[in-house]
A protein has these predicted regions:
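Substrate-engagement module of ASCE P-loop NTPases
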Residues: 157-158, 163-181
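Walker A/P-loop NTP-binding active-site region of P-loop NTPases
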Residues: 35-100
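N-terminal pre-Walker A segment at the start of P-loop NTPase domains
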Residues: 14-30
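Short amphipathic alpha-helical segments and helix-helix/interface helices
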Residues: 64, 135, 168-172
Length: 181
């Protein structure tokens, strides 16, 4: 029992094999699922962090590729930086034929990169349009896995960090509501 000054909350017991276990979604990435005791938490967002060149994009693509190939779970890849063509080429260098998965409607690459000519932001920033595009793609392709590359790119496009942060939290809440990993 946890007791605080103004209220008392009762938590379920944590002993026993079925109490408080998190259902995991296997990534199929060699060694990773062992380290994470089965994979990533189902229906939750996981932040993959690291400096440029550490393999965040490769990890995300590997997660989606294996989900489609090994578990028949369609996926969505949202890109803010690289073009879909570059993503397909990079994946091919690892022997992953993502183009075939795109053609089979098992993978959808949503290009959310900014206009190369730049953009003028007027009014309030929000991700409502992007959230709806992702939601539509999830429904259309019956996706179970979603990767967004990269959240950092969103922050770099706008000055109002607190607003972008709020919108990212809205996006994560929506993905959780939908139940994708």
């Amino acid at each position: 029992r946890f007791i605080h000054k103004c209220c008392a909350m009762q938590f379920p017991p944590t002993s026993g094999p079925t109490q408080m276990q998190v259902q995991k979604l296997p990534t199929g990435i060699e060694g990773f699922d062992d380290v994470c005791q089965g994979g990533l938490p189902v229906g939750r967002s996981t932040l993959v962090s690291g400096t440029s060149g550490t393999g965040k994009t490769v990890f995300s693509l590997h997660f989606l590729h294996n989900g489609i190939k090994d578990f028949d779970e369609p996926g969505i890849f949202v890109t803010f930086e690289e073009s879909p063509l570059d993503i397909l080429r990079n994946a091919a260098s690892f022997g992953w034929n993502l183009q075939e998965m795109v053609e089979q409607d098992k993978l959808f690459i949503l290009d959310a990169s900014p206009d190369p000519d730049g953009q003028d932001v007027a009014g309030n920033f929000d991700l409502s349009g992007l959230i709806e595009r992702i939601n539509y793609a999830i429904r259309k392709y019956k996706a179970k896995r979603v990767a967004i590359d990269s959240i950092t790119a969103v922050f770099q496009q706008y000055d109002a960090v607190f607003v972008v942060r709020r919108e990212i939290f809205r996006l994560i809440a929506r993905l959780k509501e939908i139940g994708v990993t």
